[in-house]
């Protein structure tokens, strides 16, 4: 079973949930999760919680305890907030390169699913008739303590966008597409992304135009990290990675060297851009 996670305290999340139920035939079951009705469509459960999802460590265990199923993939339907209030449709995996400021644990990463993230990015881009930005975000915030792959797909970046009906429709269709296709074979090259700003412009461009599929992305502002964290990012990627990709100008000198050395050590392709 796969899970779409929503929360009552997030306007974008409720917008997306509403569109999933209205447009994609998710129907209410007798089951409850965190006291809220569980909706189902085939092998996908649509769950709702009552608090911020970024603090929901061990969600997979809670699902197993309450519903008796171990999810194979969790998609969080969420808002994105930023001071710039840039209208955006984004996807990313969660975790903390250093100190945990917003959920999760210090130096802990959730399990990335590069195929699901790339499928999300491509579908968001295809459906985007709003003229908004479509991009990856760097790995950030919680939850980090999940033992199954997960990703956030988000509407940003202010209340005006969170409640936009078309944005909700795009996110709902994207989520269904991801869940239907993430388990199939694709000719993608999974990559660890290093460098650049929070919205990972170079990684986004590479993924939209070519075969690279990013899991964890380490932005410049979170650098430097040690080799152990880079190795953890690879280990916490479903199936591992084939490529270490570096946004050269957007990466500090010592991280360039660490990335190149690690690629050599692990016999991975190294791309500097």
UniProtKB/Swiss-Prot annotation:
It catalyses: a D-aminoacyl-tRNA + H2O = a tRNA + a D-alpha-amino acid + H(+); glycyl-tRNA(Ala) + H2O = tRNA(Ala) + glycine + H(+). One of its GO terms (biological process) is D-amino acid catabolic process. InterPro entries: Deacylase_DtdA_archaea (IPR018033), DtdA (IPR007508). Keywords: Hydrolase, Metal-binding, Zinc. The keyword Acetylation does not apply. It is an enzyme of class 3 (hydrolase). Binds 2 Zn(2+) ions per subunit. It comes from the Archaea. One of its GO terms (molecular function) is zinc ion binding. Its cofactor is Zn(2+). Its EC number is 3.1.1.96. Monomer. Belongs to the DtdA deacylase family. PANTHER family: D-AMINOACYL-TRNA DEACYLASE. D-aminoacyl-tRNA deacylase with broad substrate specificity. By recycling D-aminoacyl-tRNA to D-amino acids and free tRNA molecules, this enzyme counteracts the toxicity associated with the formation of D-aminoacyl-tRNA entities in vivo. This is D-aminoacyl-tRNA deacylase.
């Amino acid at each position: 079973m796969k899970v779409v996670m929503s929360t009552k305290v997030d306007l974008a999340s409720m917008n997306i949930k509403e569109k999933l139920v209205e447009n994609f035939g998710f129907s209410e079951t007798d089951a409850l999760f965190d006291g809220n009705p569980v909706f189902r469509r085939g092998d996908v459960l649509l769950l709702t919680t009552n608090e911020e999802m970024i603090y929901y460590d061990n969600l997979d265990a809670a699902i197993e305890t309450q519903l008796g199923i171990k999810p194979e993939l969790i998609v969080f339907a969420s808002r994105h907030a930023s001071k710039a209030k840039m209208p955006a449709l984004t996807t990313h995996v969660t975790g903390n390169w250093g100190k945990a400021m917003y959920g999760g644990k210090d130096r802990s990463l959730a399990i990335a699913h590069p195929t699901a993230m790339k499928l999300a990015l491509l579908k968001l881009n295809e459906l985007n008739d709003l003229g908004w930005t479509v991009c990856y975000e760097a790995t950030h915030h919680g939850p980090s303590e999940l033992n199954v792959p997960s990703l956030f797909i988000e509407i940003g970046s202010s209340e005006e966008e969170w409640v936009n009906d078309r944005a909700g429709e795009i996110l709902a269709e994207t989520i269904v597409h991801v869940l239907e296709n993430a388990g199939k074979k694709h000719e993608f090259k999974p990559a660890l992304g290093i460098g650049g700003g929070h919205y990972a412009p170079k990684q986004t461009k590479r993924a939209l135009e070519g075969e690279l599929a990013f899991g964890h992305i380490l932005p410049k502002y979170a650098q430097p990290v040690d080799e152990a964290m880079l190795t953890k990012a690879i280990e916490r990627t479903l199936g591992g990675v084939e490529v270490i990709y570096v946004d050269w100008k957007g990466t500090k000198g010592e991280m360039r060297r660490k990335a190149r050395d690690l690629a050599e050590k692990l016999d991975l392709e190294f791309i500097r851009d």
